[in-house]
């Protein structure tokens, strides 16, 4: 049992860091938008922005041996569409799970269901305000 979700963060190099949450599916876009908003001062530095967003998502569960995991260029157990944050392009996109070989992120379709501006994503799903 669980409510498994994966969150993909594209680094400046094009590689991806994937955050897996065993119980992270409920309100996943709102939680991600809040985390991305907290990282807004560092959106121009994918390493820092990803660290801030991941820290916000994991919150107080850093000491737990279960519940959260980090992967590189692959998703794991999944029950939802997959959100992708691209810091360099400042975009948010949503992808389907796809186990076909040849995908950039193993287990996720290369083709987005839709893409939107990262600021617009935060404004739509978060209570946080974006600094201008």
Give the location of each predicted region.
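Short, solvent-exposed aromatic-acidic interface loops
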Residues: 17-30
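Low-complexity intrinsically disordered segments
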Residues: 36-132
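Short beta-strand scaffold segments in enzyme catalytic cores
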Residues: 4-9
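Short acidic-glycine loop/turn motifs at beta-strand connectors
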Residues: 10-15, 87-89
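A broadly conserved detector of short glycine/acidic/proline-rich loop/turn motifs that flank catalytic sites
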Residues: 13, 24, 98
């Amino acid at each position: 049992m669980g409510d498994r979700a994966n969150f993909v963060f594209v680094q400046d190099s094009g590689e991806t860091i994937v955050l897996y949450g065993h119980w992270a599916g409920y309100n996943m876009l709102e939680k991600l938008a809040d985390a991305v908003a907290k990282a807004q001062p560092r959106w121009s530095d994918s390493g820092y922005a990803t660290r801030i967003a991941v820290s916000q998502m994991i919150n107080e569960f850093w000491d737990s041996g279960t519940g959260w995991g980090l992967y590189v260029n692959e998703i794991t157990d999944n029950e939802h569409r997959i959100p992708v944050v691209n810091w360099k392009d400042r975009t948010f996109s949503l992808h389907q799970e796809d186990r076909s070989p040849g995908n950039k992120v193993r287990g996720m379709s290369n083709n987005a269901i839709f893409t939107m501006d990262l600021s617009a994503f935060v404004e739509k799903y978060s209570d946080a305000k974006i600094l201008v």
